[in-house]
From Swiss-Prot:
Residues the record lists as N6,N6,N6-trimethyllysine modifications: 4
A single GO molecular function term of this UniProt record: ribulose-bisphosphate carboxylase activity
Substrates-to-products reaction catalysed: 2 (2R)-3-phosphoglycerate + 2 H(+) = D-ribulose 1,5-bisphosphate + CO2 + H2O; D-ribulose 1,5-bisphosphate + O2 = 2-phosphoglycolate + (2R)-3-phosphoglycerate + 2 H(+)
Residues that, per the record, bind substrate: 163, 167, 285, 317, 369
Record protein name field: Ribulose bisphosphate carboxylase large chain
């Protein structure tokens, strides 16, 4: 029998509502906005086709393989309530379509060409179900939450961080001084800003040396293990690894990477190096809002978070529910759970479309940062719990008396909140009172409370269900 040339509807091949999903399938939930006149079944089938085996016309080489075995299948469609002409389309992909241990390949398939497809007005990948058969091919985070706590010898509370500001323009020596003051004051970590790489005013090697000196000095004086996220992000993978090697030689505990601008291949490479050499890996998500901020087009951050857990990172910025950078509470807590927990049940009220079983892949600490200060501490402690990093940049360095008192204020506020919680007090209701009580015996905290008592960033969150 000759093959039948020509263009035929995608839905004839790729829309299979009777399909029963397999445990090994990768499942995707897309928010699809078809062009006017395109039925949802055709749009859903087109997404399945273009992100797996299909092309725009029938080709004779289709006969050389088993399409039934390899094709993506649109198996369910539901309308989005309250939105006109918007659908959630569920697609199942056979596992054979993906290279083992490669987030890069997974994304190239699932969100490659299909987002430019003309029959769709807009397309957003809302969630992915990664089957254990696939997640087991990834190393995941270099160390994970428990190993990190054991390395740092810090338990029972969130960790405190601070991004050194101004983010660009300081010399290496002045930068190191700021790091020392913050760590000496009581923070656990300080952080390179995501755009600090190796610029003319401060080359990476000088920064690494002065930060290591600051770290060891603060450690000796406080008796606590300290860290500074040394940003190893670079223009090439080789240069990035060179920086990570130097960090290891200095004996520091943690390095950092910008995983979206650096790319998943570079990130996974660095993650492997970090596990092999005992370095923790802090991940910044610079550029994420370009991809995830539009409600009807792009990729939701919960997918980028899952991808990071597979690719590898011990911390990742996860947005906050208070402060200057947006995050909607239930949705944020949904992907915070996806980062930390072993098994996360489907829960549409939190934007989780699939039950995700990570089969003991190490967890990632969510990092809350962006416009937060001491008055937010009770809310942050309650919302994020112990397994998190709370990062105050301006909220430390903006203290009227300087960096070290700023760090003291944050540490006192945190310890007060943790103690109050452990005594059974309600942080949501009594938060301000707890901070006020603590500030009576901490002049540093009292000064911080005075400076930031009126500051609010109140805008509508873009990211709603």
């Amino acid at each position: 029998v000759g093959f039948k040339a020509g263009v035929k509807d995608y839905k004839l091949t790729y829309y299979t509502p009777e399909y029963k999903t397999k445990d090994t399938d990768i499942l995707a939930a897309f928010r699809v906005t078809p062009q006017p006149g395109v039925p949802p079944e055709e749009a859903g089938a087109a997404v399945a086709a273009e992100s797996s085996t299909g092309t725009w016309t029938t080709v004779w080489t289709d006969g050389l393989t088993s399409l039934d075995r390899y094709k993506g299948r649109c198996y369910h469609i539901e309308t989005v309530t309250g939105e006109e002409n918007q659908f959630i389309v569920y697609v199942a992909y056979p596992l054979d379509l993906f290279e083992e241990g490669s987030v890069t390949n997974m994304f190239t398939s699932i969100v490659g060409d299909v987002f430019g497809f003309k029959a769709l007005r807009a397309l957003r990948l809302e969630d992915l179900r990664i089957p254990p058969a696939y997640s087991k091919t990834f190393q995941g985070p270099p160390h994970g939450i428990q190993v990190e706590r054991d390395k740092l010898n810090k338990y029972g509370r969130p960790l405190l961080g601070c991004t050194i500001k101004p983010k660009l323009g300081l010399s290496a020596k002045n930068y190191g001084r700021a790091v020392y003051e913050c760590l000496r004051g009581g923070l656990d970590f300080t952080k390179d800003d995501e755009n600090v790489n190796s610029q003319p005013f401060m080359r990476w090697r000088d920064r690494f040396l002065f930060c290591a000196e600051a770290l060891y000095k603060a450690q000796a004086e406080t008796g606590e293990i300290k860290g500074h996220y040394l940003n190893a992000t670079a223009g090439t993978c080789e240069e990035m690894i060179k920086r990570a090697v130097f960090a290891r030689e200095l004996g520091v505990p943690i390095v950092m990477h910008d995983y979206l601008t650096g790319g998943f291949t570079a990130n996974t490479t660095l993650s492997y190096y970090c596990r092999d050499n005992g370095l923790l890996l802090h991940i910044h998500r610079a550029m994420h809002a370009v991809i995830d901020r539009q409600k009807n087009h792009g990729i939701h951050f919960r997918v980028l978070a899952k991808a990071l857990r597979m690719s590898g990172g011990d911390h990742i910025h996860s947005g906050i529910v208070v402060g200057k950078l947006e995050g909607e509470r239930d949705i944020t807590l949904g992907f915070v759970d996806l980062l930390r927990d072993d098994l996360v049940e489907e829960d549409r009220s939190r934007g989780i479309y699939f039950t995700q079983d990570w089969v003991s892949l190490p967890g990632v600490l969510p990092v809350a940062s962006g416009g937060i200060h001491v008055w937010h501490m009770p809310a942050l402690t309650e919302i994020f719990g112990d397994d998190s990093v709370l990062q105050f940049g301006g909220g430390t360095l903006g203290h009227p008396w300087g960096n070290a008192p700023g760090a003291v204020a944050n540490r006192v506020a945190l310890e007060a909140c943790v103690q109050a919680r452990n005594e059974g007090r309600d942080l949501a209701r009594e938060g301000n009172e707890i901070i006020r009580e603590a500030s009576k015996w901490s002049p540093e905290l009292a000064a911080a409370c005075e400076v930031w008592k009126e500051i609010k960033f109140e805008f509508e969150a873009m990211d709603t269900l």
